[in-house]
Regions:
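Aromatic-lined substrate-binding rim segments of carbohydrate-active enzymes
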Residues: 77-130
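Conserved, mostly hydrophobic/aromatic
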Residues: 31, 67, 75, 118, ...
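Catalytic domains of carbohydrate-active enzymes, especially glycoside hydrolases
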Residues: 58-84, 187
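Boundary at the C-terminal end of the N-terminal hydrophobic targeting segment
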Residues: 21-25
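Active-site-adjacent "subsite" loops/lids of carbohydrate-active enzymes
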Residues: 27-29, 35, 39-58, 116, ...
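Active-site-proximal loop/short-helix segments
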Residues: 84-92, 134-146, 186-199
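Hydrophobic faces of well-ordered beta-strands that scaffold small-molecule active sites
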Residues: 30-34, 75-77, 125-127, 192-194
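Bacterial N-terminal signal peptides
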Residues: 7-18
């Protein structure tokens, strides 16, 4: 009887042990932030003509190629900066980082292009959204009529010369959620990265 139980246990273990080798591999995120504010990481060329649009695109492709070679698999792409964005939006205007002029249309969709190029390289793109800071008084003036400080002043606060969305106001949640909804409904992004959730 004892020998029979030992044999049964050995047979059962013979089936169980090999199955443990088929566990799902761990997915590892190897990410970096790609800053568009002031062209810190990208773009260094302003999209003002067909030639400079192409230079802007080539620069992004070179950056993504370098990240791929360095074994990154995720790009946290700064999509909302300080009250402005890098895609055509019904809520906020284009950032001056793209054209040199706040609200200037770069005549292509940089977010769509970045997503396509990341996916072409087998990389994910997460939309990096700066949530609370809007900018100093000079920067907010440049945002003009489309600035959230003009459209929805009740959710904005000026503190020591810098404008912020008010995280204590429930309408701020609605405003930020509308930006996220706009992005996820229009683009094939792989994630959302919320940053500066503070004063």
């Amino acid at each position: 009887m004892y020998n029979r139980l030992i044999t049964i246990y050995i047979v059962i273990l013979g089936f169980i042990i090999p199955l443990s080798g088929y566990a799902q591999p761990k997915y590892e995120i190897r990410a970096t932030w790609l800053t568009t504010l002031g062209g810190l990481d990208w773009p260094s060329h302003k999209a003002t003509s067909a030639k400079t649009i192409e230079l802007q695109k080539q620069e992004l492709c070179k950056t993504l190629d370098a990240l791929k070679r360095a074994n990154f698999n995720t790009v946290l792409f700064q999509t909302r900066l300080r009250g402005d964005v890098i895609y055509p939006s019904a809520i906020e205007q284009f950032t001056e980082s793209l054209t040199g002029h706040e609200g200037g249309n770069p005549n292509y969709d940089p977010l769509k292009f970045a997503i396509e190029e990341c996916h072409r390289r087998g990389m994910e793109l997460h939309a990096w959204i700066v949530t609370i800071p809007i900018g100093n008084t000079r920067q907010v003036k440049l945002l003009g009529k489309k600035s959230v400080t003009r459209k929805q002043p009740s959710i904005c606060k000026l503190y020591k010369g810098t404008w912020y969305l008010d995280p204590g106001n429930p309408q701020t949640d609605n405003y930020l959620a509308s930006i996220v909804r706009e992005i996820v409904s229009r683009y094939d992004i792989d994630g959302i990265h919320l940053d500066y959730i503070r004063y």
